[in-house]
Amino acid sequence: MTLSSGWRFLIPEEYAQLGPLADDPSVRLVAVAKTKDEGNVPTFVVTGGALSTDASDDEVYADSVRQVEEALPGFHLIDDFAWPMLPEGARWRTGVYILDDVSLTLSQLTWITRTAPTTQQPPQRFLWTATCTCPSVLFPTIIDDFITMAQTLEVTP
């Protein structure tokens, strides 16, 4: 992935500050906007993992929205639509929630990839998310970076 100007990847020492996410194998990448402010810094997080369900892609996408709603009390989904660019079949979501009296906006690109079947293994599906979260007042200045960076993502299971 190529970061936009003004963004940087977390260094290993900073991962410890992520709490339980620090050891979560589904978290593949974390980037933050370079800012003088402390607290709610814009973040870009990529997660991915194998799906262990026979649910349809649409059901997987619907369940992933429910997981966001459960993880973020008060989360209000604003948009959820088919993403018209690559990766093919992706969904784009945007929503808002309040954390510690700060309005935060979350935008997420979600998609499913498949491995090719082999003689030893059937094809496998993987769910990926690229999520940008920032204070809502910064959203107009952050969204273009997120879209640009998301378009440079390449994932491997």
Please annotate each region the language model reported.
Residues 1-59:
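Secretory pathway targeting signatures of secreted, lumenal, and periplasmic proteins
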Residues 7, 13-15, 127-157:
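Surface-exposed amphipathic alpha-helical segments
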Residues 120-128:
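Short hydrophobic/glycine-rich mini-motifs in sensory/regulatory modules
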